[in-house]
From Swiss-Prot:
A GO term, aspect molecular function: DNA-binding transcription factor activity
Residue ranges with Low complexity bias: 199-224, 257-276
Annotated GO biological process: adrenal gland development; blood vessel development; cartilage development; cell adhesion; cellular response to chemokine; cerebellum vasculature development; chemokine-mediated signaling pathway; closure of optic fissure
Subunit structure, as described in the record: Monomer.
Positions with biased composition (Basic and acidic residues): 178-198
Chain's role: DNA-binding transcriptional factor that plays a role in a broad range of cellular and developmental processes such as eye, bones, cardiovascular, kidney and skin development. Acts either as a transcriptional activator or repressor. Binds to the consensus binding site 5'-[G/C][A/T]AAA[T/C]AA[A/C]-3' in promoter of target genes. Upon DNA-binding, promotes DNA bending. Required for cell viability and resistance to oxidative stress in the eye. Promotes cell growth inhibition by stopping the cell cycle in the G1 phase through TGFB1-mediated signals.
Record-given protein name: Forkhead box protein C1
UniProt lineage: Eukaryota, Metazoa, Chordata, Craniata, Vertebrata
GO CC annotations, alphabetized: nucleus
Subcellular location: Nucleus
InterPro entries per record: Fork_head_dom, FOX_domain-containing, FOXC1/C2-like_FH, TF_fork_head_CS_1, TF_fork_head_CS_2, WH-like_DNA-bd_sf, WH_DNA-bd_sf
Keywords: Developmental protein, DNA-binding, Nucleus, Transcription, Transcription regulation
Domain of life from the UniProt record: Eukaryota
Species of origin: Xenopus tropicalis (Western clawed frog)
Length: 495
């Protein structure tokens, strides 16, 4: 009887022997060690607690463990390793017509697995839940020919491959009817898509490509700016654009002369294409209006002045005409427009064919009318052939009070002296018949500007070159773009 009670059984189960009043915990432990012989190391120290009635305690302890000994459970009482879905599927597939009632499912499970016979854990309720909640089981109404109770249950045709390799121990996935519908729909869509792509004619693709090409071409043509070369007439003069509003503002290019001096004279195709043409459109359609000097002399009064379109410019070279004309913006920066050839080729040269044409550098100021009467004596007389030639060939750039050609262009209330600084080109010898240009950059009162003009007039008289061929420039003290010395009058012939 001692062989049935090993030491591992009470220790593994965590069972403490029942202790009476005469027993102690150590005597019980010693009895357990002596019974199994497992705790040999503890037998010697536990012997000191031994009692004369040791044998009877040992026998009593063995009898005390008798009722709690786990009996070997028969195989029929072990729960089968199948899910309720697998059990129901077994019952349905075992039926001759592949359909069975709920009572038939119960009978099949109890006959096949005896565990469910005596077990009252509510497995029948679990069977009913699985039948209702799983879409793989379909309820079939009972026929009138077969009287009875309850409806039949069968498997969905798409759920026969629900278990892997026919093994009810492993199920692939939870069966859902919508997944089957999705799979079928996806297959149909793929098949239709392949057929559609295969039957699509090549002409439709070509038509689509042509439409895309046309849209791209329209986009490119819409974004391309208007260039001066595209609007030239047969005689070389540039005709102003017709569909542009005169209210558009001209954006002049602002650079220092040093950075632009690296540009060499080239072909007429070197004109910047971002040049605004609204200035020329405005001068061909609207005579501009001049501000009067009653409000005092300021930068606002020397805004960009529009000149008349060159009507009699047949003798003028096309590079001079095609170059853009800008004025002084209401800021302290000097603006210039690079032309086709070298950047600062002057229109103040007597022969207009010098250098193959060039850009212009204008500062058209309305304040020039303040001393135009005083300076008319220093200019070349209007009745000389040289003055007439210059004024005829340069109707836009040199307009004086002694000529009638300025009035023929019909839009100047006050004359302007458009000047080009010749010292950028080192061509002081070719200058003539033009007056100097002043560049006031900040707002000054009337008296200071008048004094500056007087000093320039005196500088013209005392120039080492005669007044007709000298080009003078007067800079205000605040103009730090070129030089910062105290002298305000520079002789262009030095450079």
């Amino acid at each position: 009887m001692q062989a049935r009670y090993s030491v591992s059984s009470p220790n593994s189960l965590g069972v403490v022997p029942y202790l009476s009043g005469e027993q102690s915990y150590y005597r019980a432990a010693a009895a357990a060690a002596a019974a199994g012989g497992g705790y040999t190391g503890m037998a010697a120290p536990m012997s000191m607690y031994s009692h004369p009635a040791h044998e009877q305690y040992q026998a009593g302890m063995a009898r005390a463990y008798g009722p709690y000994t786990p009996q070997p459970q028969p195989k029929d009482m072990v729960k089968p390793p199948y899910s309720y879905i697998a059990l129901i599927t077994m019952a349905i597939q075992n039926a001759p017509e592949k359909k069975i009632t709920l009572n038939g499912i119960y009978q099949f499970i109890m006959e096949r697995f005896p565990f469910y016979r005596d077990n009252k854990q509510g497995w029948q309720n679990s069977i009913r839940h699985n039948l209702s909640l799983n879409e793989c089981f379909v309820k079939v109404p009972r026929d009138d020919k077969k009287p009875g109770k309850g409806s039949y249950w069968t498997l969905d045709p798409d759920s026969y491959n629900m278990f892997e390799n026919g093994s009810f121990l492993r199920r692939r996935r939870r069966f859902k009817k919508k997944d089957v519908v999705k799979d079928a729909t996806k297959e149909d869509k793929d098949r239709l898509l392949k057929e559609h792509h295969g039957s699509q004619p090549a002409a439709a693709q070509q038509q689509r490509q042509q439409q895309q090409g046309q849209a791209q071409a329209e986009q490119d043509s819409g974004s391309q700016p208007v260039r001066i070369q595209d609007i030239k007439t047969e005689n070389g003069t540039s005709s102003p654009p017709q569909a542009m509003s005169p209210a558009l503002s001209t954006v002049p290019k602002i650079e220092s002369p040093d950075s632009s001096s690296s540009m060499s004279s080239g072909s007429p195709h070197s004109i910047p294409s971002n040049r605004s043409m609204s200035l020329e459109a405005a001068e061909s359609h609207h005579p501009h209006q001049q501000h009067h000097h009653s409000q005092g002399f300021s930068v606002d009064n020397i805004m960009t002045s529009l000149r008349g379109s060159p009507q009699g410019s047949g003798e003028l070279p096309s590079p001079l005409i095609s170059s853009s004309r800008t004025g002084i913006a209401p800021s302290s920066l000097l603006t210039y427009s690079p032309g086709q050839g070298s950047i600062y080729s002057p229109p103040c040269s007597q022969g207009t064919s010098s250098g193959g044409g060039a850009g212009t550098y204008h500062c058209n100021m309305q304040a020039m009318s303040l001393y135009s009467g005083d300076r008319s004596g220093h200019l070349t007389p209007a009745n000389t052939p040289a003055a007439t030639t210059v004024e005829d060939t340069l109707p836009d750039y040199s307009i004086t009070t002694t000529t009638t050609s300025a009035l023929s262009h019909g839009n100047q209330e006050h004359p302007h002296q458009g000047r080009l600084p010749s010292w950028y080109l080192n061509q002081a010898g070719d200058l003539g018949h033009l007056a100097g240009a002043t560049y006031p950059g900040q707002q000054q009162n009337f008296h200071s500007v008048r004094e500056m003009f007087e000093s320039q007039r005196l500088g013209l008289n005392s120039s080492p070159v005669n007044g007709n061929s000298s080009c003078q420039m007067s800079f205000p003290p605040s103009q730090s773009l070129y030089r910062t010395s105290g002298a305000f009058v520079y002789d262009c012939s030095k450079f």
